[in-house]
Amino acid sequence: MAETQAPTGYLFSEKHEWVKVEGDMALIGISDFAQSALGDIVFVDLPKTGKNIKQFETFGTIESVKAAEDLYAPIGGEVIESNSALSKNPGDVNSKPFDSWMIKVKGFSTSELDKLLTPEKYKALVAGLE
C-alpha cells in the first residue's frame, strides 16, 4: 500500500478524522487512510448548521460500497457550515480527502487540539495498521 498522506498543518484523531484550524474556525474531514479503507464513497450524512458537537463523539455517517461508518469529531464546537457539495459529489472525499472538508466548526477549545496526533504520529499509527 502506498504511504498514507498526512500533510503539515493538519491534526488527526485515532479514528482517522482530520482537523485544520483556520483562525477561529476549523475544518473537519476524513483522512487519506480512511477514504482508502472505505473504498468508493457514495453518501455522506452531515449535521445541520448550529448543531453543537463534542470531541470524539459522532457527528455524522459516511457510506461506501463496502460499509457505513460513523464520523467522529476530532474537536468539539458549533457547526457553522456543512459541505453541501459532498451530497452531490461524495466521491470527492476519495479523490481529494484534504480538500473535501465535511464540516466547519467554531467555538472549539484549543486544549482539545493537544489530544490529537501530529502528521508524523498519525503516519506511525497508520503504518502499524497496514
From Swiss-Prot:
Cofactor(s) of this protein: (R)-lipoate
Organism, scientific name: Leptospira interrogans serogroup Icterohaemorrhagiae serovar Lai (strain 56601)
Domain of life: Bacteria
Any one Gene Ontology BP term: glycine decarboxylation via glycine cleavage system
Subunit structure and binding partners: The glycine cleavage system is composed of four proteins: P, T, L and H.
InterPro entries: 2-oxoA_DH_lipoyl-BS, Biotin_lipoyl, GCV_H, GCV_H/Fam206, GCV_H_sub, Single_hybrid_motif
Pfam families assigned to the protein according to its UniProt record, in alphabetical order: GCV_H
Official protein name in the record: Glycine cleavage system H protein
Keywords in alphabetical order: Lipoyl
Cofactor comment: Binds 1 lipoyl cofactor covalently.
N6-lipoyllysine: modified positions: 66
Gene that encodes it: gcvH
Purpose of the protein: The glycine cleavage system catalyzes the degradation of glycine. The H protein shuttles the methylamine group of glycine from the P protein to the T protein.
SUPFAM superfamilies, per database record: Single hybrid motif (SSF51230)
Protease found in the keyword field: no
